[in-house]
């Protein structure tokens, strides 16, 4: 039985969307895997963008290393892929109109070569029978990052219109005497929520400040909060900077990515990129019948839902920086358990939700996997 891991942290140093806690998340997870789960340091690959001696977390390098990790796994092995960095989402192509989240969720490598949920699905579907791959993604819009895997905890597999309807009905049940103005205000606020604008972010104002904020704590301590969300305009700006291409058209972003990066991925991933032509969203069948049909050996723990943002936290007094979800995981795993049993995937995600809610975060972690993994111990047995 082998235990292997690929840990990726991207801070995007020197850019307008720089983060502070992603690389720290990687080092904390590395320590956790070694001390709590018996991983050998030689079997952990680290990719960070703050140390040039490390393999740089470009789109191609991430895909290559994840391919290597999956190819090396045999029956009885436990594999871990941890990602901390920016995330984004784009409308699906015509071939993905049945995506139950209604969007293509992506992670954002340091070279802006997006890795989409279909690519994760294709790679994870190659995990061998009897081998288990656990993916932890502390990034915005990470709910549903592996396409077509069953949602066990979360609300990402609902179409936006269904989410609005559910939220309005729930609000009406709690406050049945709302006036007409308040009723329609609720509709507007819930529509904003489906676009990834949470209440806490709306409260912080618009523009750049819409994904930054501060929380005052006791003893003159302040948390500087920045979400791990890369606005499309910022993504385009960084893409132009990274590639030297100044004439990138937003409406042709998929074709542009294929042109810029299509030669880098493997043939299978090239196919995934070549399908990025049409940006229509189909609100039809959720494709639930396909869930569990593929990627049976992959488990995803997401930092938030597909329409939410994961927080990057900086403690001004101590200088500590971390992802809110990554911190929740570490705090929960390090706490003694009364029953002395190993924490399960379901328990970890459920407890992380409570942990974050108590601390004022709006993000809700999710669990995506086959039914048989829900109550299995986190990472390994």
UniProtKB/Swiss-Prot annotation:
Induction record: By UV-C light, hydrogen peroxide and methyl viologen.
pH curve summary: Optimum pH is 7.5-8.5 with t-butoxycarbonyl-GRR-aminomethylcoumarin as substrate.
Species for this entry: Arabidopsis thaliana
Keyword Lipoprotein applies: no
Keyword Protease: yes
Pfam family for this entry, one: Peptidase_C14
InterPro entries per UniProt: Metacaspase, Pept_C14_caspase
Post-translational modification remark: Proteolytically processed; by an autocatalytic mechanism.
Protein name: Metacaspase-8
GO molecular-function terms, A-Z: cysteine-type endopeptidase activity
Enzyme class: hydrolase
Family named by the database record: Belongs to the peptidase C14B family.
Enzyme Commission code(s) on record: 3.4.22.-
Function per UniProt: Cysteine protease that cleaves specifically after arginine residues. Does not cleave caspase-specific substrates. May be involved in the modulation of programmed cell death activated by oxidative stress.
Catalytic residues identified in the record: 86, 140
Keyword terms, alphabetized: Autocatalytic cleavage, Hydrolase, Protease, S-nitrosylation, Thiol protease
GO biological process assignments: hydrogen peroxide-mediated programmed cell death; programmed cell death; proteolysis; response to hydrogen peroxide; response to oxidative stress; response to UV-C
Highest taxon above the source species: Eukaryota
């Amino acid at each position: 039985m082998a235990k292997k891991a690929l840990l990726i942290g991207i801070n995007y140093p020197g850019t307008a969307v720089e983060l502070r806690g992603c690389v720290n998340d990687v080092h904390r997870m590395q320590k956790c895997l070694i001390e709590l789960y018996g991983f050998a340091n030689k079997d952990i690959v680290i990719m960070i963008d703050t140390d040039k001696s490390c393999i740089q977390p470009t789109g191609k390098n991430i895909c290559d290393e994840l391919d290597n990790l999956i190819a090396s796994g045999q029956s009885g092995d436990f594999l871990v892929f941890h990602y901390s960095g920016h995330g984004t989402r784009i409308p699906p192509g015509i071939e993905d109109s049945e995506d139950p989240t209604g969007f293509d969720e992506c992670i954002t490598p340091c070279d802006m070569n997006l890795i989409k949920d279909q690519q994760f699905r294709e790679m994870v579907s190659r995990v061998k029978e009897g081998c288990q791959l656990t993916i932890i993604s502390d990034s915005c819009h990470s709910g549903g990052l592996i396409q077509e895997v069953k949602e066990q905890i979360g609300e990402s597999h609902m179409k936006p219109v269904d989410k609005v309807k559910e939220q309005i009905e729930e609000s009406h049940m709690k406050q049945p005497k709302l006036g007409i103005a308040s009723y329609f205000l609720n509709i507007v606020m819930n529509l904003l929520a489906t676009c990834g604008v949470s209440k806490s972010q709306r409260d912080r104002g618009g523009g750049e400040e819409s994904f930054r904020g501060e929380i005052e704590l006791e003893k003159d301590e302040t948390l500087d909060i920045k979400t791990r969300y890369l606005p499309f305009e910022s993504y385009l700006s960084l893409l132009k900077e990274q590639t030297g291409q100044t004439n990138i058209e937003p409406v042709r972003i998929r074709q542009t990515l294929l042109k810029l990066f299509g030669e880098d991925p493997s043939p299978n991933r090239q196919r995934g990129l070549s399908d990025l032509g049409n940006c229509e969203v189909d609100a039809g069948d959720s494709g639930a019948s396909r869930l569990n049909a593929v990627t049976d050996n992959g488990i995803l723990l997401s930092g938030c839902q597909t329409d939410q943002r994961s927080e990057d936290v900086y403690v001004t007094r101590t200088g500590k920086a971390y992802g809110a979800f990554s911190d929740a995981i570490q705090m929960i795993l390090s706490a003694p358990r009364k029953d002395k049993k190993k924490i399960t995937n379901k328990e970890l995600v459920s407890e992380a939700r409570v942990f974050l809610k108590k601390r004022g975060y709006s993000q809700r972690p999710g669990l995506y996997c086959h039914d048989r993994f829900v109550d299995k111990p986190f990472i390994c047995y």
